[in-house]
Amino acid sequence: PVNLRTEYLREPIGLDTKSPRFTWEYKGSEKNFLASRSEIRIGTSPDNLQPYTDNMTLEPHTRYYWNVTVWDQDGDICETSETATFETAKFKSSDWSGKWITDSHDKEFEPAPMFRKAFTLGKEIEEARVYVAAAGYYDLFINGKRVGENYLDPGYTHFDKRILYVTHDVTSLLKPGGNAIATVLGNGWHNVQSKAVWNFETARWRNRPRMLCELRLRYTDGTTEVIATDESWHTATGPYTYNNIYSGDKYDATLEENGWNAEGFDDSKWDPVQVTEAPAPLLAAQQMPGIRITEELQPVSMKKFSDKLYVFSFEKNFAGLSRLKVKGAPGTRITLKHGELLKTDGRLEQGNIRSEERRVG
């Protein structure tokens, strides 16, 4: 057996089901192979795996090891797979220690909220996991480094019924002594602030972005510690002065605060956060592959129309992020627009994009 998966994922670290589904593939040369029996063995140590049964109880925040043995149509053992792993996350609301937080602004306020907390670790860390739920999108940082490779997390739901949370391994980002955890929240699908297709601007769940975060630490001496969102966090706004899932972002670099997401930053002028109610009654693990950068593309051509207007063509349609390196005086405004078509003279054609969905900044 090869390609072992738990809940259809390879080596997942954030499962919230007590009865996961195990799958695998047969890789062999026998075309008429038929499996007559299989046995899954599971345990918290790779050296002590026991037969898996339906009444086996899994614990939250635990790594499990498993393999599978397959018998062929003649009743002979075909082979035993290599050992795979998965980790459970949270099974119920009482597994969470944190509180939902936001800032003091309402849903029409445009600048994106930023949050941070400094903390000190006095012991050697064995492993660390962070669990993040957000009404809106989040970018999470620990000691100034972005957590994970995913973008646009968490995924879309009916935000007044169910919110997804994402689990990250952040062991390598932490250090003994002073540390900091920080995040910036985007509106995403949760708070569309302009007229939009399917009337998202009138969605019943619309509200200011908010988050729930829990950093769970296990030390080498076997003890654990949890650092979670609560009243001790601080909040401010910064360079993201506008963000919209349809029409884009406005970013003002003059509002940047260097080191805001790192340890040692002075957040004494930041405001205290507002502890708020949960936006939905149900929290569920996001059990799907994340949206990630899989390829970097270079423009195929560049056409200059004036000293202030350039068109870069990639000659293909794709979803992605743009990276542009520029020089200019502070306060210089640069507008980056995207489109799927070009006009006959090579200029950008946005006529096939609804006016309210065109990028504004």
Positions of the model-derived regions?
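Extracellular/oxidizing-compartment recognition motifs
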Residues: 1-359
